[in-house]
Amino acid sequence: MGRVEGVTEKPSNWNVPNVLTSLRIIFIPVFAWLALDQRWGAAFGVFVALMLTDKLDGTIARTYNLITDFGKIADPIADKALMITALVVLNVASNLPVWMTIVIVVRELGITMWRMWMLRNDHVVPASKGGKVKTVLQTVGVALYLCPLPSWMDVPSYVVMVLAVVVTVVTGVQYLVDARKVNN
């Protein structure tokens, strides 16, 4: 049978962006093991590679129209799973303050569950510019804690993580304020 004009096929779930997302999930335990074993250079390398796949899968999905329902759900789960794992591992094996992890995890899980609920009700909540800044700050902060750096870098690493926490909270509040405006 031929294609019906005006009808577009949904992309298959078996596509490059979804494979990259799945690989990110599969490699989280490898990252955690390396960090818990204090193989900081290797853990840093795996973390950076996994974060790059996050950027890459999104770019490929948008460029080639390979956005799928699986990707909409699995990608944010993979992102949060990696970041939460990294934060918890740094609490256990390094000197990242626990309060930072608690604040970030509560916000990430809360907003992610809310976005999933909105998606389930056919409302896509796109990532905000502030959310992208938050992700960059969290990524850089975690990378600084993972990277074997001289002790004089402890203060700059801490400052980046404090900024990440502040932006995490502010963007979380902003999502809720924006949602309230939409619902009113």
Identify the function of each model-found stretch:
Residues 1-184:
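Alpha-helical transmembrane bundles and membrane-interface segments of multipass inner-membrane proteins
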